[in-house]
Amino acid sequence: SSTEQQRYQQSQSFKNHLTTTLQHVRPTSVTVGWLVNDDRAVIYYLATPPNLYKQISTCLKNNNLIFDNCRVVVEKPIGSDLESAKDINNSLSAGFQENQIYRIDHYLGKEAVQNLLALRFANTIFEKSWSNSAIDHIQITVAEDLGVEDRGGYYDETGALRDMVQNHLLQILCLIAMEPPVSIQSESVRDEKLKVLKSLAPFTKENIGTNSVRGQYLDGISKGEPACSYLNEEGVDSKNNTETFVALKLEINNWRWSGVPFYLRTGKRMHSKSSEIVVRYKSVPHNIFSKEAALKPDQLVLRIHPDEGIDLKLNTKQ
């Protein structure tokens, strides 16, 4: 049939491309058979648009290029919604075992982000106050000073919510809000993160307007130079309302965090590039000092970028 012929042509094209690419990297008669018969590990790193993950995985399987000693790495976003994410994961699982699949969020590789687990679970100083008994709210900010640059076509189908919030910012939120894992092993950390995500209060028609803000950057000045609006960027549909800025108020419905809002914000073409977490503590229940002494709430600031570090802001005598 024409469908089978098309699949065959796609398969052959993919196989030829893979072989050619490998020979380009290693000129000495590299063949696909070398991959399968050699003992060394092979990693398929899919640095491609997510809509190609399914096709690539299927072609690898159809060409017998999936074997015990290989791994596949996929980057975010894995799909554009729940259905496409399930479709991609099902296609990956059809060829690879779960322990062969690596779903990568490169933001978790940042030293300051990795340090969140150590900060929380290797120190006792914060644990007693790490809950709604002492914390008023938590802010997570990832601001970028650049526009979409040469990613207009990709970004126009994605937006800030899918590009940043559903991976980077939610990963940070999970590390901040999760309970202590049984161990530092990936499965244990994953299980505690999942509990946080399941506890997030869903948006409703009644609260979506007050708990979220979306926007696009306009014409302006960036780094001292004129910069065009998002709708005038190359590859962007001028009729689209894809957001380049999003701010959310999230709530976690569990004993530790009930009543503590989490404010997430991210955007492009912001004033400066910075990433930080601000833990704002509650004010003292009663001010015993003079009325002129304006006591500010304590703050723990975890700086991810540009200068990694920790600031603890307290009230002291002037």
Predicted regions mapped to residue ranges:
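Secretory/organelle targeting and membrane-embedding segments
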Residues: 1-74, 78-318
